[in-house]
Amino acid sequence: DIGPGCVTCHDPHSSVKLDNQAEGTGLQTSCTDCHTMAVKHNSFPNCVTCHMPRATRSAVVNAVDYQGDIKTHIWKINTAAVGKDDGMFNAAGTQVLEDGDGLSAVTLDFACYSCHKDSEGVGGGFSTKTLQQLSDYVLGVGEYAGTGGIHSPTKKLIAER
């Protein structure tokens, strides 16, 4: 077993369809039921903002470059300063890359550019950041040296916030 299955988070007897007729929410647990580490970031993003970005496309194509039309269920984030073309998909763009353990990871452009903008101004409405700046911030290195990274310096439980 390499990670959580569908029923770890979703209730198999509730609908996950996004409409007004769906019964229940489809979720039976939240991230904080298993994870207790808080993030060192502003108060806006929640866990799924970064760890479940809209990096997946179904039959609908969205013109926004860093956003698919459905949320991915690849929770791991590749913290290297590489974008989707070099760090998430194969050269043809037809498959998600896997590491030696068979795990995939979303790249920082998907995880961060839904809120931040790249150097061309593409992305969300917040500050412009390069992939290197995003990587340095997440890891707590470079201009962010000594900060400990986005997860590590905050040791208190989320319930204590």
Which ranges hold each PLM region?
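Inter-heme linker and motif-flanking segments adjacent to c-type heme-binding CXXCH motifs
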Residues: 1-157
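Short, solvent-exposed mixed-charge patches
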Residues: 159-161
